[in-house]
C-alpha cells in the first residue's frame, strides 16, 4: 500500500470518471465539472466524451462518460463525499444498482493509493469497463493499475466489450 500524507501536500494524479444517461447528458457532465471547479478541484486533463451502451442492460439509455485528471487538497473520503454532494445537487437520488442516472462521479484512482475499507481504491471494477479505460488512456497513456501492476494498454486489449464511440 502506498503511504503518503495527503493532508499536507496537494495530491497528484487523481482520476475521476463522470457519466450520465438521463436528460441532457453533456450538460449534466459540464455542470458536474463546474461544481468540481467551484469546490477547488484543479483540472490537469479532461478526456473527450465517450458514448457507451448502458450496462448491464443495453436497453436502458446510453451513457456519456469522461475521465478527468485532477489535483485536490481533499483526502480520499473527503473527495468521495464531495462527489456524492455534487451528484445530489444535480438531482441524483437513491435508486437500484445500475439504474439510469443524471450524474455519476467515481474516483478511479487516487494517486496510486490502495484502500479496501469503506472506500475502495482504485475503483474495484474500473479495469473491466471500456467507458473508464478508453477515456483514461486518452489522457494518461502510461497509466498502470495500482494493484494489478498492468498498464492501461493491456487492460484495454483484455476487454471483452470494446463497443464505444
Feature roles, as predicted:
Residues 13-15, 19, 131, 145:
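Short glycine- and Lys/Arg-enriched binding-loop motifs that mark or flank ligand-binding interfaces
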Residues 45, 54-63, 74-81, 85-165:
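Flexible, gly/pro- and Lys/Arg-enriched active-site loops
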Residues 2-16, 22-95, 111-112:
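Nucleotide and nucleotide-moiety/phosphate-recognizing core
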